């Protein structure tokens, strides 16, 4: 049985209007993966005799977007010779950041789209910082709209130098920089004949070489719970995605913060594991599973709890504890000061938190302190802060278990900040 191709999740980032949607559209169009709904519309319009034009497809995708329907994520799967690629999101989406952090899919790589006409813009930087904060290890850069600068190598080299400077200061190494015109199809899927001076990969070739994501099986078991079912004749069945470690039938698992809240261990033996309605003996990172636990009732656990082994239980931050975090403020109408109390979204948990201290403003590129104990922080700032949860929650330092160390901060229906847990301070 040949080994299945690795699945890789990618996100598209970059400044508004630099061509993210067009690039996604071109990838789907040239690989024959345009959403069914659009092909149907084309047929309904009786356009049979006319060629199925890229511009027309982009207009339909734009209409769907404006009606609030982004290209349905389910459609944006395509294959390269060595990879199954899923485009999990693109930042036109209001909940882009929250989805990237709490979504079922952590991105393995990001495609940063930069327009040759503009070069590096504020959002280019912000999205690059964000990719770094979210722990995205691999970046592919496209310098897009090359048709608008007459496919000029000098312009390409100039913008490429700007982007390289930005990404290298963020710690990215060895990333391809590809001159493209998504609108005309140059170097997205098909090699361009307009830029003989470029001999690197096309975008699809670069996507085909994204390193296979490693499965963190050696880390302690962590399964954030999405739902809990009570199934007749079986018992309590929590459902969630294994983030780290492995779960075997017969293991004893404990749930947190449930055990902390009820002041007694909520734990039991795993009697069975199921994935896609098939029984499993062992579940690994990335597996979405249901598992039956002896002696745990449906009322003991809920979404946001995390299952782990009893010898290395999930870390609970209680209301008397605090945690130190590095955050990047993405969108706040005024300024954040001590006492601000928004909602923290981490893995499947959502809990109110309070800003206890703002320790420092930092340079997001180097991590160096720019200002100690600032009075406030605002949109665009990176900072080291101390937060206190208003309800117990499982969080892990990002250096130990990154999957449970990243979070979004939301308020007023929008994502205010993204961050990562540096350390946890236990209160007495």
UniProtKB/Swiss-Prot annotation:
GO molecular function, a single term: GTPase activity
PROSITE patterns: G_TR_1, G_TR_2
Catalytic activity: GTP + H2O = GDP + phosphate + H(+)
Top-level lineage group: Archaea
Residues that coordinate or bind GTP: 14-21, 89-93, 144-147
SUPFAM superfamilies for this protein: EF-Tu/eEF-1alpha/eIF2-gamma C-terminal domain (SSF50465), P-loop containing nucleoside triphosphate hydrolases (SSF52540), Translation proteins (SSF50447)
Chain spans, region G5: 181-183
Positions annotated to bind Mg(2+): 21
Region annotation (G1) ranges: 14-21
Main localization category: cytoplasm
Stated family: Belongs to the TRAFAC class translation factor GTPase superfamily. Classic translation factor GTPase family. EF-Tu/EF-1A subfamily.
Function: GTP hydrolase that promotes the GTP-dependent binding of aminoacyl-tRNA to the A-site of ribosomes during protein biosynthesis.
Stated name of the protein: Elongation factor 1-alpha
Annotated organism of origin: Pyrococcus horikoshii (strain ATCC 700860 / DSM 12428 / JCM 9974 / NBRC 100139 / OT-3)
Lineage, opening ranks: Archaea, Methanobacteriati, Methanobacteriota, Thermococci, Thermococcales
Gene name of the record: tuf
């Amino acid at each position: 049985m040949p080994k299945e191709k690795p699945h890789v999740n990618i996100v598209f980032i970059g400044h508004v209007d630099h061509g993210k949607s067009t690039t996604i559209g071109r990838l789907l169009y040239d690989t024959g993966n345009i959403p069914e709904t659009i092909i149907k519309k084309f047929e309904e319009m009786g356009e049979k005799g006319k060629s199925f034009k890229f511009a027309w497809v982009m207009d339909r995708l734009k209409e769907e977007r404006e009606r609030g329907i982004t290209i349905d994520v389910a459609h944006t799967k395509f294959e390269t010779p060595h990879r199954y690629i899923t485009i999990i999101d693109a930042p036109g989406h209001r909940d882009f950041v929250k989805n990237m952090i709490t979504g079922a899919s952590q991105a393995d790589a990001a495609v940063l789209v930069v327009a040759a006409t503009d070069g590096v813009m504020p959002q280019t930087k912000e999205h690059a910082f964000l990719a770094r904060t979210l722990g995205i290890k691999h970046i592919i850069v496209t310098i897009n709209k090359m048709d608008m600068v007459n496919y000029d190598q000098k312009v390409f080299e100039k913008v490429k130098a700007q982007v390289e400077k930005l990404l290298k200061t963020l710690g990215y190494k060895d990333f391809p920089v590809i001159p493209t015109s998504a609108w005309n199809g140059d170097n997205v899927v098909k090699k361009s004949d307009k830029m003989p001076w470029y001999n690197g990969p096309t975008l699809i070739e670069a996507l085909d070489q994204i390193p296979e994501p490693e499965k963190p099986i050696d880390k302690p078991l962590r399964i954030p719970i999405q739902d809990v079912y009570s199934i007749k004749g079986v018992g309590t069945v929590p459902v969630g995605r294994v983030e780290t470690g492995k779960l075997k039938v017969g293991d004893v698992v404990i749930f947190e913060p449930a055990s902390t809240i009820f002041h007694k261990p909520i734990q039991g033996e795993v009697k069975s594991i199921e994935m896609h309605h098939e029984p499993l003996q062992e579940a690994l990172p990335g597996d979405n599973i249901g598992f039956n636990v002896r002696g745990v009732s449906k009322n003991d656990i809920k979404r946001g709890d995390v299952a782990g082994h009893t010898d290395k239980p999930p870390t609970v931050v209680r209301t008397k504890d605090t945690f130190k975090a590095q955050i990047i403020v993405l969108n706040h109408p005024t300024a954040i000061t001590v006492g601000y109390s928004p909602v923290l979204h981490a893995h499947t948990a959502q809990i109110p938190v309070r800003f206890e201290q703002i320790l420092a403003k930092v340079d997001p590129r180097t991590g160096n302190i720019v200002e100690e104990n600032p009075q406030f922080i605002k949109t665009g700032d990176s900072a080291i802060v101390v937060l206190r949860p208003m309800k117990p929650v499982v969080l892990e330092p990002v250096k130990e278990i990154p999957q449970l160390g990243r979070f979004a901060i939301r308020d007023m229906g929008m994502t205010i900040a993204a961050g990562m847990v540096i350390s946890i301070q236990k209160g007495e």
